[in-house]
């Protein structure tokens, strides 16, 4: 599926002169009324890296100017609204035109919130691998943990040493949601609160 799509996009780039990043570089596409090809011989080879992707980090420049994204469950700063699905679909198109195959669709994403789930859906619908932000082990950031506790009436700290049962419950809840997608590269590293410090600054250190 991806190979066929990349083949079509390669023809678009090489013979229709459509730049893979045309949506972002302000280069107008010149319409061609006809294209004559006497012979086409394009060969490609496997890339050295199996996963080639982009991480949409602090997606403030992709939202706010386009309605339809919906509210986010992470408050503060520019995290108050999600990127509209029509916008993320164009980002995914660019990713495919660049022959990439993996996307982290947002800085923080809570699949229990439909507007945020739409971002993951837009990626998965095009057959691309999904992955998670480096402070979202198994799809759960400290913010997602807080959302879960608030919504489902749970209490506890984002700390496996202090609250292992609730942490395992939250992880299981979100693993079930992420596992519904065919292609996921799982993040299993454990970070502290947010993105600015390691876990041992928030949790009790162990011998490990």
Predicted regions and their residues:
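A general structural detector for well-ordered alpha-helical segments in enzyme core domains, enriched
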Residues: 91, 119, 170-174, 208
